Regions:
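Start-of-helix register in tetratricopeptide repeats
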Residues: 19, 53, 60, 87, ...
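Alpha-helical segment of the N-proximal tetratricopeptide repeat
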Residues: 19-47, 57-60, 64
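Register position in tetratricopeptide repeats
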Residues: 30-31, 64, 98-99, 128-131, ...
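Short coil turns that delineate tetratricopeptide repeat
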Residues: 49, 83, 117-120, 153-154, ...
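Canonical tetratricopeptide repeat
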Residues: 57, 91, 124-128, 161, ...
Length: 244
């Protein structure tokens, strides 16, 4: 009986110690001190190498520190332990994407989509999938993924990305429609689009559609050193004069 009580006491002490370490790691992660959180998470994993909380948090810390190799190792361990967990496949897809492994990222995101019916997670998956497909220059696939994302949520970034895909395909009318929709969505949510490439591509699309005044306004947002902004702005001014 005494031995059992002693053993139970040790277990409780161990649990309390782990809880303290988890709290300490959480505080550092919240404060974005990821390099300080990792040694604490290491201590937890020495005691229990399969601690899913510690593995996930350490993977996240490595990812924020742009150590994608180590981040992938931890999330891959979780996938081995829980092969039907869609979130883990999604997170590994994120890590692979950030590390430039776009085709592998696409594969993991597709697995996550197959495993989950959760609307929020599916929306995240489709947006990540759209970005990965775009990086692979699979513009039609990127358009489809953006369209799927927009069934779940409305965000200007999805319209911008789909607009960029249309732009790459030289479908300037559809690109312009998405760029204008992005502005409307951002305005509705009291956000501002400040990305130079957005206004450059929007201006190019307007120029291609014969909307010279609108294009001129967009090109004036950019400085002369951004791509061929000065040339396009001068072309707009010339076209506006010709139309008078």
């Amino acid at each position: 009986m005494v031995a059992r009580i002693f053993a139970l006491s040790l277990i409780l002490q161990s649990c309390t110690s782990i809880q303290k370490k988890e709290f300490a790691a959480s505080v550092r992660i919240t404060n974005e001190n990821y390099d300080e959180a990792i040694p604490i998470l290491n201590e937890i994993l020495v005691v229990n190498p399969q601690n899913k909380w510690a593995l996930l948090k350490r993977s996240m810390c490595y990812s924020f520190l742009e150590n994608y190799v180590e981040a992938e190792k931890d999330i891959s361990k979780l996938i081995e332990l829980y092969p039907k967990n869609a979130e883990y496949f999604f997170h590994r897809g994120e890590i692979l994407y950030e590390g430039g492994a776009y085709s592998e990222s696409i594969s993991d995101v597709q697995k996550a989509l197959h495993l989950t019916a959760n609307r929020k997670l599916r929306s995240y998956c489709y947006y990540l999938l759209a970005n990965a497909e775009f990086e692979q220059k699979n513009y039609l696939a990127a358009i489809r993924a953006c369209t799927d994302y927009l069934k779940y949520a409305q965000h200007e970034n999805a319209y911008i990305l789909r607009g960029h895909a249309y732009f790459q395909l030289k479908d300037y009318s559809d690109a312009l429609h998405d760029y204008n929709t992005a502005l409307s969505v951002a305005k509705k949510n009291r956000r501002h689009i400040t990305n130079n490439l957005f206004y450059y591509n929007k201006g190019r699309s307007e120029l291609a559609c014969g909307l010279y005044k609108e294009a001129s306004v967009d090109f004036k947002r950019l400085n002369d050193e951004f791509y061929k902004t000065k040339e396009y702005r001068e072309l707009c001014e010339q076209k506006i004069k010709e139309c008078k």
